[in-house]
Amino acid sequence: MSQAQDDLRDLERLAVELAQLAGDRIIASLGTALAVKYKKLSREEEAEAEFRDPVSEIDSAVEAVLRERLAERYPTHAIIGEEEGGGDLPPGDYTWVIDPVDGTANFVNGFPIFAASIGLVHKGDPIVGAVWCSTSHALRPGV
């Protein structure tokens, strides 16, 4: 196996580990009262919108943990998160893209179809990803 293949496997393992961590945190929160906010919309959207794009405290907490783990392991990689956006690092060769609770509206309303998603993009091309699924607790990695 080449060094590049080993590196991809390491990145895939990390994506799987973090997706599982997100899933574990989400499961631990089930049945608890959640604080929910709604994302700010543009003026045009706001005029037409009712409550949409919820963000739970679990979304924010899980994203914070994932960001912390990624920054410890790969401090030069950029991170784009569903809740916090692009952060302080400018996009570089490697950018992690995370959605800590993909399907928050379902999650906060007790509808059990949601996921945790994490992926890595290298120079604009997706190279690694992992998705944890709420209905089966299955992890789906991809390189």
Map each language-model feature to its residues:
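N-terminal subdomain of lithium-sensitive/metallo-dependent phosphomonoesterases centered on the IMPase/IPPase/PAP
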Residues: M1-V101
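DPxDG-like acidic metal-binding loop motif
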Residues: P90-V143
